[in-house]
Amino acid sequence: MLLSWIEDPNADDLVAFLNDELRQPGRWLQVAGEMEVEYPGRAANMESAGDYLLILKPDASLQIHAARGIKPLNWQPQVENAPVMQDGGRAVLHAERRSPAEWARGAFL
């Protein structure tokens, strides 16, 4: 069930919306749009700007999918922290986990 959505937001509105959604227990967070993806961990990658789907599930797992293919570009089994902040005029989700220590970042363009 779709509980809330935002269309074509500016960076400030997207940051506020996503952080509000992340505070709601048991919510699925799905963001589709143009973004850059960075992950310096086990399978390091830096994806150029493109259309991606970012999913943060109620079990705190994170997946980032490209427009093609069935496997995610990045998958984190459980993130402890996933704040959304503004950086350089863009909304950025920075998901972190402690064990192993790694992070994934999605910058929404």
Where are these regions (language model features)?
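Short acidic, glycine-rich loop/turn motifs
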Residues: M35-V37, A66-R68, A95-P100
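Surface-exposed beta-loop interaction hotspot
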Residues: L93-L109
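Acidic, aromatic-enriched beta-alpha/helix-loop junctions
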Residues: R42-V92
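Short Lys/Arg-enriched alpha/beta "domain-start" segment
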Residues: M1-S61
